Amino acid sequence: MTPPPSRRLSAPFHLPRCTGEENAASSSLAKRGRWRAANAWRDGGGVLAAALALVMAVAPAAHADMPANWTKPIRPYRVVGNIYYVGSEGLSAWLIASSEGHVLLDSGPSAEGARLIERNIQALGFQLADVKVLINSHAHYDHAGGLAQLKADTGAKLWISRGDEAAIEQGHHIGDNDNGPTPMQPAKVDKAFGDSQKLKLGETTLVARLTPGHTIGCTTWTTAVVEKGRPLTVTFPCSLSVAGNVLVGNKAHRDIVADYRESFAKMRAIPTDVMLPSHEEQGDLLAKRQKQLRGDPNAFVDPTELSRFVDASEAAFNKELARQQSARPGAKR
């Protein structure tokens, strides 16, 4: 029987050499998850933890038509300061390290995606048990579908905005959407928060800035780091895309248009040196990583990128809103 992982904090703030060991770690992680499921009652998990573990063990894989790069492995790396990329080729996941434990932002689309993230965390030399808090950009399956698995495997607390709490716990997107409810594995929320919530862990502070629209509780996270003596502001923007949302006559999210408009203005006003989005293509992360590997110390630094991201998102939103209004001229916003 595989023993539970060590609770010893790993040494943060350096990039250990990545090897093929992350691939070999997959089977041991799966065994560890089964060990925790079988022994949840022994370590304080209780009936709920055991039930969730059982569901995860038997739940079929969903969204088989998702883009291949959403689950394609990529070597993890340090971005700036104490921030590490631990996601797949197409879907971001960010580890924010501290001397008192780490924060993980986003989870991938499924248990499989969560295990990919876990292997990347371990490949960087960190311990899964040192991940103390899980946070999320928004309650869509591609970013939240692996939260339950990560919570079971790390023992971390899950922090979710109040607007997305129900979606995370019920296991599906809330709001009228042309793509349907897009189910995901539900996860128990430990802390629901509002705007400007601060998450402090060691020397790291993250601030939640609610930017609803894409989902009701869409959350943009900000933090500050130091890179070789240079202070940098970092923003993890929540998506601003429409992504199938019904903008005209949305009964489940009646203020959706006003929410989008307020979020465009709010995000545009955030001072940002480094923008780290939830999808690779939203920030050309692969190209930036190649620049970094070639020795560019400012590969991820661009003080104008967030405003360009917002401008492009707002233009696309206005175009889609006009289309929906033309298609339903008698409907109310």
What are these regions (language model features)?
Residues 20-21, 31-36, 42:
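Glycine-biased, low-complexity coil/linker segments
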Residues 45-59:
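Bacterial N-terminal signal peptides
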Residues 65, 72-73, 78-80, 115, ...:
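Metallo-beta-lactamase
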Residues 65-69, 228, 242-333:
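Accessory terminal helices/loops
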Residues 69-124, 128, 221-242:
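Conserved beta-strand hairpin/beta-sheet module of binuclear metal-dependent hydrolase folds
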Residues 105-108, 131-139, 159-161, 211-213, ...:
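Active-site neighborhood of phospho(di)ester-bond hydrolases with catalytic His/Asp-centered motifs
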Residues 112, 139-145, 165-168, 216-219, ...:
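Active-site environment of divalent metal-dependent phosphoester hydrolases
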Residues 112-115, 119-198, 294-295, 301, ...:
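Active-site HxH/HxHxD metal-binding segment of metal-dependent hydrolases
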